[in-house]
């Protein structure tokens, strides 16, 4: 997480869905990391390790990064996979709905853990009903958000706005190939023009231009 924050430090970033997913992952990881401090403390862990507090903690660490990271990755690579943009409006509604549901679900689990609700039990005391009802509602909200996001994927795949080969103006090699991606990825070896972590030409080019650049770099065959 520190690497991600350090990468953004003094940088310019934009408010599109893939970037919002990065912020969501950072937020969830921060919550998971802070609550993990309590689980590393022996006196506190004696109380927390067998109840819903630790359940909420590892969901923030694993699901909080995996789910929203996957949604951001889909939004980012959707133009490369399909040649079309993911519907930003519908996708964002689904994303933020799932994010809100995630907070409702697992924040209430922290409360249940602080109250002492044990994990891995079928029945529990009535004092935990409110926390569990709130958590259940949050889980349904996550599901609704995922369905909306799935609808954005399906509708965009069918009739979304056509995207260029490199809509993000990225300079990494995965965006230097054509869309749709040809069988061999590159017709010629890609030209590396910059340092390792900002390599590539500014925009993907057609095969003839790439081949011309390659010939200029290594010498045209005689």
Tell me what each language-model feature is.
Residues 1-21, 37-54, 69-94, 108-130, ...:
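Juxtamembrane membrane-water interface segments of multi-pass membrane proteins
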Residues 7, 24-35:
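Accessory "access/gating" subregions that flank catalytic or transport cores
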Residues 25-29, 94-107:
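Hydrophobic alpha-helical membrane-insertion segments
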Residues 32-36, 59, 110:
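Residue-level detector of functionally special positions within alpha-helical transmembrane segments
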Residues 60-67, 132-146:
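Hydrophobic alpha-helical transmembrane segments
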Residues 95-98, 138-141, 221-222:
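Metal-dependent phosphoesterase/phosphodiesterase active-site architecture
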Residues 118-127, 156-222:
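Extramembrane terminal tails and long inter-domain/linker segments of multi-pass membrane proteins
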């Amino acid at each position: 997480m520190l690497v991600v924050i350090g990468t953004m430090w003094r940088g310019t970033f934009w408010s599109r869905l893939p970037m919002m997913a990065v912020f969501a992952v950072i937020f969830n990881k921060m919550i998971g990391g802070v609550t993990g401090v309590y689980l590393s403390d022996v006196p506190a862990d004696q109380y927390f390790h067998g109840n819903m507090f630790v359940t909420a903690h590892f969901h923030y660490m694993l699901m909080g990064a995996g789910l929203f990271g996957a949604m951001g990755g889909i939004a980012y690579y959707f133009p490369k996979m399909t040649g079309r943009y993911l519907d930003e409006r519908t996708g964002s509604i689904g994303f933020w709905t799932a994010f809100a549901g995630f907070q409702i679900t697992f924040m209430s689990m922290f409360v249940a853990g602080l109250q002492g609700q044990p994990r891995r039990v079928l029945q529990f005391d009535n004092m935990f009903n409110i926390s569990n009802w709130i958590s259940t509602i949050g889980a349904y909200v996550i599901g609704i958000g995922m369905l909306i996001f799935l609808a954005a994927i399906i509708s965009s795949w069918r009739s979304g706005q056509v995207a260029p080969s490199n809509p993000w103006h990225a300079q990494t090699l995965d965006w230097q190939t054509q869309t749709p991606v040809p069988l061999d990825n590159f017709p010629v070896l890609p030209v590396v023009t910059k340092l390792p972590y900002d390599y590539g030409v500014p925009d993907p080019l057609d095969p003839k231009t790439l081949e011309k650049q390659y010939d200029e770099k290594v010498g045209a065959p005689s």
